[in-house]
Structure formats: C-alpha cells, structure tokens
Regions:
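C-terminal beta-signal and adjacent terminal beta-strands/loops
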Residues: 250, 375-387, 409-462
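Outer-membrane beta-barrel signature, preferentially recognizing the C-terminal barrel domain
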Residues: 104, 187-249, 271-309, 349-354, ...
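Transmembrane beta-strands of outer-membrane beta-barrel pores
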Residues: 7-15, 119, 132-140, 183-189, ...
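Gram-negative outer-membrane beta-barrel transporters
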Residues: 246-248, 266-385, 426
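Flexible glycine-rich, low-complexity coil/linker segments exposed to the extracellular/periplasmic environment
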Residues: 19-100, 259-291
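Extracellular loop and loop/strand-boundary signature of outer-membrane beta-barrel proteins
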Residues: 96-102, 147-156, 211-216, 286-292, ...
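Surface-exposed extracellular loop regions of Gram-negative outer-membrane beta-barrel proteins
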Residues: 1-6, 108-172, 223, 322
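Short loop/turn motifs that connect adjacent beta-strands in outer-membrane beta-barrel proteins
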Residues: 1-3, 18, 120-127, 174-176, ...
Length: 462
C-alpha cells in the first residue's frame, strides 16, 4: 500500500472591459441622402424552414457600411452635429458600456490524502485507491452600476468549502476481464460571467421594466457520482465494454426571474440599486439573476467496442473499427415561477439522451484512411426559455444531427506525405428550435448551413 498527501493553491483572475457610444441617438439624415441609399433588399429568407404559405421572405435591411460613411460614424469622433457623437467611451460612459467592465479573482486552496493498493483477493488481482480532498474557494468580484449620472463600483465576495471523497476499485476476476467501480463527490465552480455583480437596468419609464445582476454568492455545481463497468480485452488492441453510471446532482445553477419592487431591489443590494428620485420605490421590475436550484438524478449506460481486424486475410487485416453508444436519462428540476417555488422536470440541458460514434479505418503503415459517423439526439439548451409558452413550458433546443467525416493520407516517400479530409459529408445543418415541453410547437429560430468542407494537403519533412 502507498499513502500520499499533497496540497495545492491556484489563483485565477479575469478582467473585462468595453467601449461604446454614450447614446444611441442618431443625427438627422445628411442632405441629399435617401432611405434607398442606406438600405438594401434582403431576399431568399426561409429556405429549408418549411415556412407557412404567405410568409415574408424578403424585406428592407440597413446597409451598415453605407450608414457609417453617410453619417461619418467611421471617424469614431464627435462630428459636432446633434446626435453625431460617435466616440467610444469606457468607464466614463455611464449608460451603455459599464456592463462590459468587470474583474473577478478566484483563489483555490486544497489539501488531499490518498491510499493506493495493489493486492490480491481470493486469487484475483485487486487494485485501487481511496482518498479525500478538501478545497476552499474564495471569490472576489466587481462590476459597475450607473444611476443619476453617478458611476458606482459594485463589489461582492464569497467563500465556501467542500470535502470531496473518492473511491476507485479494479478487479480482474478472470484473465483479460476487468470490473471497475468508482464513487466520488465532485464539484464544478460556476462560470465567471454568472458571478460578476454587473448591473443591467432598464429606463425608469420603460413599458416593461427589467433588472439583472450577477450573483457572487452562487454555490458550485455539486454531485455524487457512481460508475460500474465490465471490460473484456478479448484480443490485442481490442476491447468490448459495458458501463452504467448514476449521478445525483444536488446543486445546480439556473438563471431565474421574479417580480420585485425597486424598494426590494434596494434592500437586497443597496450598492447596485441605490435609492433614486427617478426610481419610485413601488415600481415593479422583472429581476433576473443566476440562482442555485435543486438539480436531480442522471442515469445511463455506455457500450464501447474497438478491434483491429488482424484475423482477416491480406490487406483486409489492416482494417479496424471503433464504436460507442451512450444512453442517458435525467430528471432535472427547473424553476418556472417568479418566486421560484414551482418546478418542471426535464432533461439536463446540452445533454442528448442518445449519442453514438463509429469509425472504420485502414492503416498499413504507408496508407491510412478512415470514415467516421457521429450521431447526437435532440437536446435542450434552455429550460424554461426566455419567451414563455402559451400551451406549456417553453424550451429551446437543437435538433438531432448525423455527421460523416472522412480522411486519408499517403506517404509518398519518407519525407513527403499527401492528405485529403472531408468534413460534414452529409451536409448537416445546425437547426435550433423554440418549442414547448408538451411538444405542441416547434419553431425554428436558428438555421446555419455551412455545407461540406474538403481540405487537401501536402507535408514535407526536411
């Protein structure tokens, strides 16, 4: 047995800045200029979208290059006419640029201990390790707010500790067969963009007043994970395996919305929302902020297979295959109400229920080629979506894709090699939709079609 201990310290710093016009006001149209000079006709919208009959497929769109030249905006200066100040300002710009200014410092301290063993039990080789890690996370974040022409630096801090035990055991019950078990408590810190106390606040007289603020007090994503796999190494460089896994996500991060009066916003964070004459205490705002929510369980299995076909005759012995299939079921609780006291259960965002990859390859040392296929099932990207549904809970997601790639290379000499690679040979498009959990509505809101890509190359070693 071997006993190990250690310590670690890491410090990260992230800074952001931005520059923008002080106002979005535009000057009067220059003399001798018409609307036609500043616009163009956008045509051909809706291809491959199956739009209903009568849908608009063309409209007038602004010509940004023409507008910049006509108004002199490309000078990035103050032209001296009303609305013609095109200077890009930073912190002194209290209306449109402050949201881009932020700095975050994260300090991570850790201590760990681990016991490794490699022994036998009932004649079977057994190896593994058991250990635990203590980690402390200290976060300091700062952003800016501007009210009544006064720019205020808004700061926040958070500090949390985690104890993360882990256990890994590998048993070889018979030759070339491995049974592996793993259990661990894991954590993943929230992204920097969720922590910054940067304020976004609509105008006091806006029809629908909104406010948003980062949340430096977020806890990390936390989960308990369990994995069990059976692996059979049935031939040289060959593997057939089956694995099951379970993850209990106990802490999740979701952006929530709730109705709050300005007085409640001030009480919550007086630095970000100071009392102001043009902000009546009773005015109601829709307040958005990242929030910790309960999470939920995730279960699934994975099948993997790889084998070179060395048992085949002649050139066929240079063939081989690699393939895997994963199925996942998850039940994540997403907050759906203003007070965050009601939830809807749906799949984990950005995770496909089914996915598989397969590669057929040939390699004789001088010539190699491979064809790969990758399938990904439909998955959610946001639950609930920003725009509410009329029949159910609105969600956004991405439709299923099947992509096929191929490549080949040939060593002409020891120094010269030629290659060709084809990407997205099935001409798959990126289609994202806005739908509802009941499946009634399916509206495309993103359709990107990049087409097939082919690359030809040559490499020479001197």
């Amino acid at each position: 047995m071997t006993f190990k201990v250690g310590a670690s310290y890491k410090e990260y710093q992230s800074e952001g800045s931005g520059y923008a016009r002080q106002t979005n006001a535009a000057p009067a149209m220059p003399a001798g200029t018409s609307i036609g000079d500043l616009t163009y006709l956008l045509e051909g919208f809706g291809k491959n979208l199956d739009l209903p009959s009568g849908s608009a497929t063309a409209w007038i769109s602004p010509n940004l290059d023409a507008i910049m030249k006509a108004y002199g905006a490309d000078c990035l200066c103050d032209t001296g006419v009303a609305g013609g100040d095109f200077r890009l300002l930073g912190l002194e710009n209290g209306s449109t640029a402050l949201g881009n200014w932020r700095d975050v410092t994260e300090k991570d301290t850790g201590l760990w201990a681990q016991l490794d063993w490699n022994t036998e039990w009932a004649g079977m080789p057994v190896r593994g390790n058991f250990g635990a890690r203590w980690v402390n996370t200290e976060v300091e974040a700062a952003g800016y707010s501007a009210l009544n022409g006064v720019t205020t630096r808004v700061t926040g801090a958070n500090n949390y500790d985690d104890i993360l035990p882990s256990l890994n055991i590998s048993v070889e019950p018979i030759e070339n067969v491995m049974v592996r078990f793993g259990a661990a408590r894991v954590m993943s810190r929230p992204p920097v963009t969720s922590l910054v106390p940067t304020l976004s606040l609509s105008a006091p007289n806006a029809a629908n007043r909104t406010a948003s603020l980062g949340n430096v007090n977020l806890d990390p994503y936390r989960a308990d994970t369990f994995d069990l796999s059976l692996e059979w190494y049935f031939a040289p460089e060959s593997l057939l395996s089956f694995a099951v896994f379970y993850k209990d996500i106990s802490t999740y991060v979701q952006t929530t919305q709730q109705k709050m009066t300005y007085a409640e916003l001030t009480a919550m964070n007086p630095e970000a929302f100071p009392a102001a004459p043009d902000r009546p205490a009773g005015d109601e705002y829709t307040f958005s902020t990242p929030t910790n929510t309960p999470g939920g369980p995730l279960t699934g299995f994975e099948i993997s297979y790889q084998q070179p076909f060395t048992f085949l005759p002649g050139a066929f012995s240079n063939l081989g295959v690699q393939a895997n299939f994963t199925h996942v079921e998850s039940e994540i609780d997403y907050c759906t109400t203003a007070a965050c006291n009601a939830y809807v259960t749906a799949n984990l965002v950005n995770l496909s229920p089914d996915a598989w990859n397969a590669t057929l390859y040939y390699d004789d040392g001088r010539f190699n080629a491979r064809v790969s296929a990758a399938y990904r099932d439909t998955y959610y990207q946001q639950v609930p979506a920003a725009n509410g549904g009329t029949r159910g809970i609105a969600v956004t997601g991405k439709t299923e894709t099947l992509s096929i790639d191929a490549s080949a290379s040939f060593n002409v000499t020891e120094k010269l090699a030629l290659s060709i690679e084809g990407i997205n040979l099935t001409d798959e498009a990126n289609r994202q939709n806005h739908s509802e959990l009941d499946g009634v509505r399916d509206s495309t809101y993103v359709y990107h079609h990049t087409g097939r890509q082919v690359f030809v190359g040559a490499r020479y070693k001197f």
